[in-house]
């Protein structure tokens, strides 16, 4: 599996805050045997998010793109809207599962607006901006990711044997 990680943070992009989530996600993915092909940190800018996601999908064609940051309700949190413009099909079960698991840890999880979806043959998942939240959310949906990617890429086998 090949992945890319996009961190969204105005403060990080200005050099005012170190990106801890992107590297934490990269380390976690590598431990799972995933090849992390690309990592980037950009500001919470709608057009820049859209163009980065589209460029990566068109040029790198990763199996998985994880975004981290910009999923809350602050005025500059626009990652779900930008992702929504990029995806062809939404996969609401990923966000539902992440919120379900996160609510066991914090009542603030209810304000997450993270989404997941497909563009071409790439799965895109929005994760929270904190390293802890990003990893916990990824762990919540990880069991479904390899199967989802196989199906997205055309695996004809049945989903569950009879």
Regions found by a protein language model. Give the residues of each.
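Non-catalytic beta/alpha edge segments that cap or flank active sites
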Residues: 1-162
């Amino acid at each position: 599996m090949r992945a890319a990680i996009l961190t969204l943070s105005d403060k990080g992009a200005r050099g005012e805050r170190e990106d801890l989530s992107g590297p934490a996600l990269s380390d976690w993915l590598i431990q799972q045997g995933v090849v992390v092909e690309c990592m980037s940190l950009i500001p919470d800018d709608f057009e820049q998010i859209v163009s980065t996601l589209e460029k990566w999908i068109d040029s790198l064609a990763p199996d998985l793109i994880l975004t981290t940051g910009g999923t809350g309700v602050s005025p500059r949190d626009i990652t779900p809207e930008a992702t929504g413009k990029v995806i062809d099909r939404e996969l609401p079960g990923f966000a539902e599962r992440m919120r379900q698991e996160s609510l066991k840890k914090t009542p603030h999880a209810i304000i997450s607006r993270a989404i997941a979806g497909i563009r071409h043959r790439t799965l895109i998942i929005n994760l929270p901006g904190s390293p802890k939240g990003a990893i916990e959310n990824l762990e919540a949906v990880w069991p479904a990711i390899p199967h989802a990617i196989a199906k997205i890429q055309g695996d004809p086998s049945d989903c569950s044997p009879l």
